[in-house]
Amino acid sequence: EMCIRDSSKGETFRRIIEEKTAILDIGGGSIQISLFDKDTLVSTQNLRLGVLRLQELLNHLNAGSTQMERLVDELATAQLDDYKKLYLKDREIKNIIIVDDYLSPWAVRKAHERGEVNAVVDRKAFSQLMEALRTKGTTELAKRMDIAEEKVPLVYISAILTRRIAELMGAELVWAPGVTLCDGIAYEYAEQ
């Protein structure tokens, strides 16, 4: 695992968590949402919405790609509504920092192609990605995103989750540092 040691990323991280921010860590079995307000950790919550868990469920339901989006949305919304009531309340979250093995590599690569250091994705770029994932074939997507074909559905599920959470929180920006935050990095920053 790699921590944010790169000072430029560390700077961006600190600047971003000064505002109301959520760190979204998407794993295979669950997702973890950590809320920051003025760079203080407010809450950390695990939801059973992992990408591999959802993929297994979709396979079990024999879901085609057309139903996939609706089903992931429904499954996520059910858990996220409770989450919102309990933890978000009326907080407006400005930014989401996403940590995963699915979307982040794509966002980082896109940023490098544009010659930018930080992989910040706004709503427009995100909509374009969703549209591509919705309409293009797996083989073409794998080529374009430079990933293995079996990873494409996982990227799609991750994107649907991220979009749902961004909508729920009213977030404007998604930042993918392209590193795994080490456990405790949040606390490290909060304690400084």
Regions of interest found by a model, annotated:
Residues 21-25:
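Short glycine-aspartate micro-motif
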Residues 1, 5-20, 35-38, 43-192:
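Helical "lid/coupling" subdomains associated with nucleotide-phosphate turnover
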